[in-house]
């Protein structure tokens, strides 16, 4: 046995306001504390695309930037040391990045672009360990096939309000499931937190669960 075993941590800081990610951590049995941005933090600014940026690079870069911002938040607030977990999800088709829709028209345009086609859902994961070191980030890639859908059906979905705040303007675990013909990859990754990769990273960061 090593003389000095690494300490384990009974919880992780989750730097996300997504209810879906909280539910998925609950599914793993991971205890967490929310590490939300302060009102004066411009978290959305971190999601700005760079010119010509590839989707893989984009989602990993944004995820790491959010993790670093969360770690700085932890230190500034004088919180107890523990690992920080951040995830970021984007939808991509034809090399384009489909983030969160700006309004109903934007949501409808995104959904119309996805209808009858296959797109990729990328979710990046970043963990900063309790000492402040960034661990190698992970990337989950899944392919989602949408069935052809009439514009009226898509418009009705937009009217539910579900597309807002979601990459690609849909939630696979919600009413958008009626459009999903098949998936190839991680269902939890499409929801926003791939559990296989999450469990591996948290165990490597000595989170007990």
Swiss-Prot record:
Keywords: Cytoplasm, Hydrolase, Nucleotide metabolism. It is an enzyme of class 3 (hydrolase). The record marks 20, 89, 173 as: Important for substrate specificity. Its cofactor is a divalent metal cation. Pfam families: Maf. Gene3D superfamilies: 3.90.950.10. It catalyses: dTTP + H2O = dTMP + diphosphate + H(+); UTP + H2O = UMP + diphosphate + H(+). One of its GO terms (molecular function) is UTP diphosphatase activity. One of its GO terms (biological process) is nucleotide metabolic process. One of its GO terms (cellular component) is cytoplasm. It is found in: Cytoplasm. InterPro entries: ITPase-like_fam, Maf-like. The active site is at 88 (proton acceptor). Transmembrane segments: none annotated. Its EC number is 3.6.1.9. It comes from the Bacteria. Nucleoside triphosphate pyrophosphatase that hydrolyzes dTTP and UTP. May have a dual role in cell division arrest and in preventing the incorporation of modified nucleotides into cellular nucleic acids. Belongs to the Maf family. YhdE subfamily. This is dTTP/UTP pyrophosphatase. It comes from Burkholderia mallei (strain ATCC 23344).
């Amino acid at each position: 046995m090593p003389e000095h075993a690494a300490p384990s941590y009974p919880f992780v800081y989750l730097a996300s306001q997504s209810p879906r990610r909280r539910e998925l951590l609950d599914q793993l049995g991971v205890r967490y504390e929310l590490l939300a941005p302060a009102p004066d933090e411009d978290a959305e600014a971190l999601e700005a695309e760079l010119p010509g940026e590839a989707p893989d690079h984009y989602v990993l870069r944004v995820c790491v930037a959010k993790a670093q911002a969360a770690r700085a938040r932890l230190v500034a607030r004088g919180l107890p040391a523990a690992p920080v977990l951040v995830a970021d999800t984007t939808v991509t088709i034809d090399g384009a990045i489909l983030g969160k829709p700006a309004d109903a028209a934007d949501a409808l345009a995104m959904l119309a672009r996805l209808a009858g086609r296959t797109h990729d859902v990328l979710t990046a994961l970043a963990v900063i360990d309790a000492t402040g070191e960034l661990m190698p980030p992970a990337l989950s890639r899944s392919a989602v096939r949408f069935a052809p859908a009439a514009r009226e059906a898509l418009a009705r979905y937009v009217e539910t309000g579900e597309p807002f705040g979601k990459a690609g303007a849909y939630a696979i675990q919600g009413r958008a499931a009626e459009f999903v013909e098949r998936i190839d990859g991680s269902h939890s990754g499409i929801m926003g937190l791939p559990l296989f990769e999450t469990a591996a990273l948290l165990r490597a960061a000595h989170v007990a669960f």
